[in-house]
Each structure stands twice: as C-alpha cells, then as structure tokens.
C-alpha cells in the first residue's frame, strides 16, 4: 500500500499556482491510474484504487500547504503505512522550472509544508518528488502563490507528466530505479 500526497492550497484562486504543482501531479496520477480524487477524508480530497496489486491512496490535503502534515499524519496512522511507502510531491524554488528530483529522504529545504510533515511524522525518512518552480524574482510568497508565466507552462506540463511517471516507477521498480531514471 502507498499513500501519495501532492501538496497545494485548496480553492479556485490557487489553481495553477506554483505552490499547487503537487495537486497537478495528483490529478495526472489519478488520470493515469483511472482514479477519482473526490472523497473528503483525512482533511484531504482522497482517491483510492489499485495498481499492479498495490493499494494506492492519493491525497490532496485541504489544510493549505503550510499545514499539510496534519492531513498526511491522519492518513499514515489510519492505514499504518510504513514511511518508505509514503510519497510526497511538492514544489521546489531551488530547482529550475520543470526540473524534477526524487529523493529517498531529506530535510524540508525550507518548504513549510514539508516542515509540517516532517514534524508531525517525526521523520525525514520518506520519499519525495520535488518539481522545480524556479527562483523568485520578487518576494517568495508572491512567487509561490503566483501563476506560471506563459513561457513556463509547457515546461511545467511536461514536468507534471514526468513526475507522475516517476511515482509510478517508484511503485513498480523501487525508488533507486526511479532516481536513476528521472533525476537529470
């Protein structure tokens, strides 16, 4: 069983913003896996299904990014998921737009949503897929809550598909394989 959480902010006003790239990947995964992420549970929109004999739980926390740990903590404890089967997908301002990075574990890198998750799970030992949103030209809040520039949209669309494929590869072949295949 896997719990896969994409970080983002709820509400129409945040759709398409840099901070919501995790939600975009969950939507792409749901499409690829034939799932609907519409049930409200664990302070999240949830989709449940099966893939290659594994139960898959997709989460879009509705707590706002900075409190994402609350939603993930509830789901992980309910399902008794080992942390190596918890995959978190989120935006990273330190990666160029459209780049993805997969890691087995690590710090928050200053991402407040990840700070919340690490604090509440009491561990940094879970896989994550980071999607580059580029360095802010202005203040950080305006950057992460801003929409992608027209010139960035193709890169992000491709990165969302690639990140979804990377998550599927983690499930099918393990994180080491996915890291060697998708980390550029």
From Swiss-Prot:
InterPro entries: Pept_tRNA_hydro, Pept_tRNA_hydro_CS, Pept_tRNA_hydro_sf. Belongs to the PTH family. SUPFAM superfamilies: Peptidyl-tRNA hydrolase-like. One of its GO terms (molecular function) is tRNA binding. One of its GO terms (biological process) is rescue of stalled ribosome. The lineage of its organism: Bacteria, Bacillati, Bacillota, Clostridia, Thermoanaerobacterales. Gene3D superfamilies: Peptidyl-tRNA hydrolase. One of its GO terms (cellular component) is cytoplasm. The record marks 9 as: Discriminates between blocked and unblocked aminoacyl-tRNA. Monomer. Hydrolyzes ribosome-free peptidyl-tRNAs (with 1 or more amino acids incorporated), which drop off the ribosome during protein synthesis, or as a result of ribosome stalling. Catalyzes the release of premature peptidyl moieties from peptidyl-tRNA molecules trapped in stalled 50S ribosomal subunits, and thus maintains levels of free tRNAs and 50S ribosomes. The record marks 91 as: Stabilizes the basic form of H active site to accept a proton. The keyword RNA-binding applies. It catalyses: an N-acyl-L-alpha-aminoacyl-tRNA + H2O = an N-acyl-L-amino acid + a tRNA + H(+). The keyword tRNA-binding applies. The active site is at 19 (proton acceptor). Its main location: cytoplasm. This is Peptidyl-tRNA hydrolase. TRNA binds at residues 14, 64, 66, 112. Coiled coil: none annotated. Its EC number is 3.1.1.29. Keywords: Cytoplasm, Hydrolase, RNA-binding, tRNA-binding. It comes from the Bacteria.
